[in-house]
């Protein structure tokens, strides 16, 4: 013990790297600093115990800001995790609505060890027509009184019920999304074989049920609500969530992009089970749905809010009303690059012209003086600012050539988090920025969208197969001030981790990737004005393409037959 103490006391205290240089062997561009570290070149770049590092997480040589933002976002998501004891089951949930649970899965899929139980419970209670129930609530929560008897299953011993708010049309495609996330994280083909037909039946319900499908337009319909929310434009609509012959109906773009994504996911999962003909049929259905949506819902710049069916519009602004699902439409790959850019440009325009503190609207313009008999403006989903629009918009901007705008959104949102003690809220007042519905709303949903924007948008790491065996790699770090960093993501459940080192110098840029990937599809953003002389993969020159998205230039190439570490150098 005395010898160990003497040895440690003789070590230098700061700024002397104590690390192996194996990572730099054979490289043209060398990493300059070991990470993790607490102090680099006199700067505090890491916390004492590296509390900022998680999955996903980042360490930089500049500061702790982005790392702490991710940590606080993870904390906000974890705060929404609790358990439900129902029907002899112990079910971990991130909010006890399957909708919120799946939207939040964008984040917790990385660390949660039980991705399956709530999905299994929901799928097992699928109704004969293919539809799903959506929320587990206590008996003294009166949502059960808002719906018909056949939309409820009671569990009296647990003082709980399982219900479906009939006016919503998003539940089925969200369950498919959740199932896809589970399968990606596990590659559990046995589970997929058991459940794929049930998932298909759910989307068949969405596209055939008289409650959900409008055959005239060939599109999914819902009760006339604000975007994807659960109260309709009619008197008593706040407390009556049924669909009756008096319920006003409409077509909302977000339901259709959701079903489109579900169809593409069903095609992908069928291919994983070698069912190619069925996969092609789902892809054809998806393309027809997208064509119909563009024909009837696209206003030339973005998707209009609602297309009323057999009822008058709520006001004269539906064709110009920008609603939150436009950002989801982009991230579900429902739009072309040109359409995606047009939607993002509309948000950028409204940022410059709005009197609100940010452009992350639920809807804009809001309904005046209120929506039906609910929520006078601006209140709740009728016109407030929301965290999940911020996250989805940032992610969308990264993907369509507005990378600097995506980074700007993240920076502005982090400023809000700092002011709010690291907290993320569901809704914010348009003018004062004060949190709204702080205790009741799904704040974790917004935090998860922001994590996804950083993970898949900024860091550009996408699992395009299962367990990161095939890696989409589209990093966009040059739009940030960070010149050297380490980014980690993956699935703790399967112990599949992607660990990326990055450095940008005058000579070029380098990415060193430790991952399970056997192949990589690279689409790497270049710094503005950079001219590429060559690209090295594992120290060997490879062919590449230069592509453009908007004014942004990327290096594109594919690499296969990979094992372990992949080293990419782009020389200027």
Where are these regions (language model features)?
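Non-catalytic C-terminal accessory modules of carbohydrate-active enzymes
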Residues: 392-572
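Generic long, charged, amphipathic alpha-helical segments
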Residues: 360-378, 484-497
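Hydrophobic core
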Residues: 9-13
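Catalytic cores of carbohydrate-active enzymes
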Residues: 20-64, 68-72, 76, 93-97, ...
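Aromatic-rich carbohydrate-recognition surfaces in CAZymes
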Residues: 94-222, 252-256, 260, 383-394, ...
